[in-house]
Amino acid sequence: MSDWERNHPEQLGTVQTERLPAPPAPPRQENLIEFYVGPTATFRYFIDAASLTVLYKQKEVRYVLVARSPSGADNVSFEAIRCPDMHRIYAVGDASKWSERSGGWQEIQRRTGVGVPGVLAREYFCPHRDTLQSAAEGVDALRRGGHPLVFTAPRNLGL
């Protein structure tokens, strides 16, 4: 099966059902790593380092995202990026429970860089459009403020 077939089953005439992964434990404050989304972001964004998982063969990076409002309220979601350009929300929740989301994979608009999935894919989790080798590599990229390989790519090619 090609990548296109795997990412667009609804266009094949038969919809394939994907088994949803079990959500990780709720995030803990000491495991949150803040990352920069852009100058117009009103929320602060964090990845729970303990939840970061890399499935290299599937080209998938799973993580818990915390979006903190200016008032301090947290929106928590269990998400994934399928490198280089697909995104999915598996579940949303709070500190005590998760609620599964039934939506499938959505394309990331990488060239515009709009939105959290685009920033995570481009700057942290899909360097040179490839998947991270390990969760430790992703945690390192978050702590550095970006993946070191990203900054060597020519910016004028729309990567």
Feature locations, PLM:
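Generic alpha-helical secondary structure signal
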Residues: 39, 49, 67, 109, ...
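N-terminal secretory signal peptides
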Residues: 1-74, 78
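Aromatic-residue detector
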Residues: 60-72, 96-101, 106, 140-156
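An exposed acidic His-Trp-rich patch
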Residues: 71-132
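N-terminal trafficking/processing presequences and adjacent post-cleavage segments
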Residues: 1-32, 113-159
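Generic marker of "main functional regions" within proteins
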Residues: 11-14, 42-47, 73, 86, ...
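Mature, folded catalytic cores of secreted/periplasmic enzymes
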Residues: 40, 88, 157-159
